[in-house]
Amino acid sequence: MGMTESPQTSFTPYQPKKGETYMGEPQKEHFRQILSAWRDELSAEMERARHRMQDETVNYPDPTDRATQESEMTLELRTRDRERKLIRKIEETLDQIDSGEYGYCESCAAEIGLRRLEARPTATLCIDCKSLAEIRERQMG
């Protein structure tokens, strides 16, 4: 699993206290920390990649070497673009935490659940709605 799919930062799984409210302040803070660390990690990786790309830009005389370098750069730029989009999604998710919308399925309003959110903190659908969406996607081709 790559950095763009879920956070790499290790964290202690959240253990709700008996009778604790779903998405109360302690849970929101738990996910705020996970998402902020993930965003910072992605930003740092993008910065490292930018420096790497600047340092590695060489004007190779051999066309094959140039082609290899260009395809590596294209792949790197695609990865950076995915990371930029993910950072935007993380920012939107942090806004959802602040507005009180976080943790609830945008399709059926059910609780998404702590374990699913820890596995995929930017999830906006509960597992049932996500499964249904994937089935529909496969049927549509």
Where are these regions (language model features)?
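Interaction interfaces in information-processing and related assembly proteins
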Residues: 2-99, 137-141
